[in-house]
Amino acid sequence: MALNLLRNYSTKIRMDHLRMTIIGAPGSGKGTQSEKLKKDYNLPIISTGQILREVSEQNTKSGIEIKSKLAAGELISDAIMSDIITEHLTKTGNSWLLDGYPRNTEQAKGLDKYLNVKMALNVVLHLDVPEKVLAERVQDRWVHPGSGRVYNSVFSPPKVKGIDDVTGEPLVRRSDDKDEEVFRNRIQTFKNNTLPLLKYYEDRGVLYTIDSPNSDEGYVKIKQILDSILTK
């Protein structure tokens, strides 16, 4: 599904009522694009990946379960994800960006029920990146554990190799990026669970698919969409 730049943008969205999510396979650039959107549009980010990694380090029942699921490249249960997301949404205002949630239709329906019609998602960005590019990206991906900032040693490297630009702390590779079998499992899980979700949002008229393997070009398209539909 290619990006349709000829879509009718007659329905405008107020900047302070922008409720958006980014959907994409592992390595599609959700974190990278989220950070750019945060900077350019002053959007609070709720990053499910970062939240889950933080919870997985806790010695609790949920933490142990999440750590096991992440290590295997499996999805976290809908119930746990719903609790985590709603807890963070209660602390956020009317405008925000969800990074990596929902991941299946049931989660989307649960989110809609929680938000109700007046507060529903009004922009869903789908980052459509070829699988070969995804595999290359995760091999070159480095993250700052404390903030979740994502770097790529090829197309978005840190100023100093292996060092976070902001804090000066060391960067690391995610454990689920190192194992090729785990990565393949994550891709298949995405196809099985998340791709049907696109039809759900397409039917609601809020889906925008960006089919660019280049991160910078993809962000240009994202800005083109948002600048066309946002109003002060």
Curated annotation (Swiss-Prot):
Major place of residence: cytoplasm
HAMAP family the record matches: Adenylate_kinase_Adk (MF_00235)
Region annotation (NMP) ranges: 47-76
One annotated GO biological process: nucleoside triphosphate biosynthetic process
CDD domains per UniProt: ADK (cd01428)
Gene: adkB
Function summary: Catalyzes the reversible transfer of the terminal phosphate group between ATP and AMP. Plays an important role in cellular energy homeostasis and in adenine nucleotide metabolism.
Pfam families: ADK (PF00406), ADK_lid (PF05191)
Keyword Repeat applies: no
Descriptive protein name: Probable adenylate kinase B
Swiss-Prot/TrEMBL keywords: ATP-binding, Cytoplasm, Kinase, Nucleotide-binding, Transferase
Localization, UniProt: Cytoplasm
GO cellular component: cytoplasm; mitochondrial matrix
Binding site for AMP: 48, 53, 74-76, 100-103, 107, 174, 186
Keyword Iron belongs to the record: no
Its EC number(s): 2.7.4.3
Stretches the record annotates as LID: 140-177
Oligomeric and partner information: Monomer.
Binding site for ATP: 27-32, 141
Record family assignment: Belongs to the adenylate kinase family.
One GO MF term: nucleoside triphosphate adenylate kinase activity
Catalytic activity: AMP + ATP = 2 ADP
NCBIfam families: adk
